[in-house]
């Protein structure tokens, strides 16, 4: 094998390695995006289920409007999903608020804001947070 053929073989190896490395990095990045999207959807579902639980308790009269803050202020839950083999931390914060969701010192306001924040495994890049403003309807 001549020197020219060895140089061509070396260039072929370098070219093939760089192409396969670029492809593998793109595949890894897409897999990471897909895992993050799956966990964001799951975290969003957890937020909605907590807020829907509060709605159901209020609708069935198991929860009084004035007790929302005392029951859900700074509470934390851990939810484990065996099919994902992941656990999520759910933080619930309830405050007395105005119609825009800004905090008020008055405990008898007609608006309550409940914020649910879900944090999870490292594949979930950012915490997912949802807010709902509840209004006292029977004055």
Language-model segments: what does each one mean?
Residues 1-48:
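Aliphatic-rich helix starts adjacent to a transmembrane/signal segment
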Residues 36-139:
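Low-complexity, Gly/Pro-rich coil/beta segments used as flexible assembly/activation regions
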């Amino acid at each position: 094998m001549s020197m020219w053929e060895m140089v061509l073989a070396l260039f072929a190896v370098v070219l093939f390695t760089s192409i396969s490395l670029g492809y593998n990095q793109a595949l890894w990045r897409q897999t990471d995006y897909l895992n993050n999207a799956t966990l964001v959807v799951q975290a969003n579902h957890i937020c909605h289920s907590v807020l829907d639980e509060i709605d159901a308790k209020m609708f069935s009269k198991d929860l009084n409007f004035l007790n929302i803050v005392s029951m859900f202020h700074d509470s934390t839950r851990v939810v484990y999903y065996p099919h994902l083999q992941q656990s999520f931390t759910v933080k619930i914060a309830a405050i007395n608020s105005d119609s825009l969701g800004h905090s008020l010192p008055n405990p008898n306001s007609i608006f309550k804001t409940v914020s649910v924040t879900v944090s999870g495994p490292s594949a979930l890049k950012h915490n997912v947070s949802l807010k709902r403003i509840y209004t006292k309807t029977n004055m």
